[in-house]
Amino acid sequence: MANTTLKALKNTVDVIGRVKEVNLELGTTRDGKENIKGNVVVLVEESVNGEARSHDIRVRVYSNKFKRDGNINGLYTGYETVMNEYKSIADVGDKKEADLVHVQGSLELNEYISQDGTKRSSNQVSGKFFNRITTDDVKKRRGPKAVATITGVVESIKDDLDSEGLPSGKKILKGFNVDFFGELRENSKPIIPFEAVVEENLADAFENLYDVGDTGKFSMKIENYAKDASEDDIEEQVSGFGFTEGLQDVKKEFVNQLNVIGGTEPFSNGQEYDEEQIAEAKEWRKKALESLESGYVPAETPSNNAFGEGSKSDTTKEIKVDDESDLSDLDF
């Protein structure tokens, strides 16, 4: 076990919506442990200023069948129920017939080196508890929604730039969360970096409250949707024969981001991370990156063939990084 000054910080996610896909399977690890793994896609629909948005929230799922004491893991049993009994839109076809679900989990880090040697990093949702709910439950729990409640340390606050390189009025928050249970091991990866957009209507209040190095709790929407195409997004009329209206290619902009919708004032009176803890957190993060890079093996360059050897997907290596969301004490 490693000696540490770090303390775990709040990291919870609540996703409420319709089950769109269930992609779970039973498997066995290299050392013979039975498990269940895969993902569940939850459709979260909302209206923002009259604009309909449909978010596909992919929730990662993993559990070994047995705990260390030899008893069956309750999470495994729950995920089996999801796999065998939950009705998804993909299965039943009719959205209204698919199950409503409340997923509770956490935000984690998905990080790997791609085939061309580029390091790629993003946040994803890791599911823990799945519960089928009713329409009334959705209303009581203020859904549909996909919201992360994260306590984090601010690493930078910068202007968001538009397509012409000018400030858009939004801010980009970069920070990190610390997520672990029990004691840290030497090979632990407890640091969860995150990047989030602060919309223009909150940007001034946020920047007036926070400085680099501050610790606070942030409520963030998890967004993954396609923007509706405007007239400017439609390409020139296609050439062809007969009636060609509606055959134009339409460009769509896909939005995949965390969006800060509120937060507390910066922590004080010992609740905040101090300089020593921040320095240690950076060391843990450095070790995680070194481990990732040392484990990278360049793959052979694939051909342009659509089949055979050229069709192999990227070999990736992932780094993995709970209670109800508490939004009652948000200050902006």
What are the language-model segments listed below?
Residues 69-103, 199-219:
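Short nucleic-acid-contacting surface segments enriched for D/E, G, S/T with interspersed K/R
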Residues 99-148:
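Extracellular-facing segments of soluble proteins and assemblies that are Gly/Ser/Thr-biased and enriched
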Residues 12-21, 96-109, 152-154, 211-226:
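OB-fold and OB-like beta-barrel modules that bind single-stranded nucleic acids
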Residues 1-28, 32, 36-38, 62-67:
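Hydrophobic, proline/glycine-rich low-complexity stretches
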